[in-house]
Amino acid sequence: MKRVFLLIATNLAILLVASIVMSILGVNTSTMGGLLVFAAIFGFGGSFISLAISKWMAKKTMGCEVIVQPRDETERWLVDTVTRQAKQAGINMPEVAIYQSPEMNAFATGPSKNNALVAVSTGLLYGMTRDEIEGVLAHEVSHVANGDMVTLTLIQGVVNTFVIFAARVVAGIIDNFVSSNDEEGQGLGMFAYMGVVFVLDMLFGILASIIVAYFSRIREFKADEGAARLAGKDKMIAALERLRAGPESGAMPAQMSAFGINGKRSMADFMMSHPPLEKRIAALKNS
């Protein structure tokens, strides 16, 4: 409920500030409410649809094979470990799956903390010790228990709304300026206006990605802390040390990558969904 109130308050604040700025700049604000509704529908619509089908998409895109009946001792241990950690975290048992990939990675997804999926790669399952795997599983279970999927969906919805809303407001200001300085008062024209909106969508979209990445990194530190409580600090540190010693993670769909144990490196830390492994290890050692 707190997230919903935060969501409403954030969008109302966006509308209020935009309306004040538009009034100062002399832009007609009579359609601001309609524009915000339009932006929110599209901004949140895509995010919530993506969240609703996240488990289905993960299974299809990653080729996840859900363990219904363990076929061997390794799968039995995997299911038992997640079962124990889920009980410790106070959530319903997530589905447990394995996907074929040589790289060591894992992810959690799902529309809610009581309707989730935890998946591990074959590279991780057979390339790590059980203590290290236990640390990884605890990290993913912590993502689920913390409600990170819903939290980041709300954040993504807010920034999507901002991008759609702000791009069209700024384009309107530009159109108004051009119109006021044009003898014919025609403004930008439809195609030029659409071009300006497109460019602004891209620019604001980059800013939005930085904001989402910032919150994602915070959630990663929180998931590491949760993993230390569920499995023990030493196991979580050992898992991160093993990941640091291994090759960089390859491509993974963005929604799964955001909740993976290990993210891809970027040209700049502020664009990364995951903090550098060195910082995560240091944070655990100093906690």
Swiss-Prot record:
EC number annotated for this UniProt entry:
3.4.24.-
Catalytic positions? E140
Q: How does it sit in the membrane?
A: Multi-pass membrane protein
Per UniProt, the keywords (alphabetical) are:
Cell inner membrane, Cell membrane, Hydrolase, Membrane, Metal-binding, Metalloprotease, Protease, Transmembrane, Transmembrane helix, Zinc
Sorted alphabetically, which InterPro entries does this protein's record hold?
A: HtpX_protease (IPR050083), Pept_M48_protease_HtpX (IPR022919), Peptidase_M48 (IPR001915)
Record's keyword annotation contains Nuclease: no
Q: Which GO terms describe its molecular function?
A: metalloendopeptidase activity; zinc ion binding
Where does this polypeptide localize? Cell inner membrane
Residues crossing the lipid bilayer are 4-24, 33-53, 154-174, 195-215
Q: Which GO BP terms sit in this record?
A: proteolysis
Q: Which co-factors does it depend on?
A: Zn(2+)
Primary localisation category: membrane
- Per UniProt, the enzyme's principal EC class comes to hydrolase
Specify whether RNA-binding is a keyword of the entry. no
Family in the record: Belongs to the peptidase M48B family.
**UniProt-recorded name of the protein:** Protease HtpX
Which organism does this sequence originate in? Shewanella denitrificans (strain OS217 / ATCC BAA-1090 / DSM 15013)
**What gene does the UniProt entry assign to this protein?**
htpX
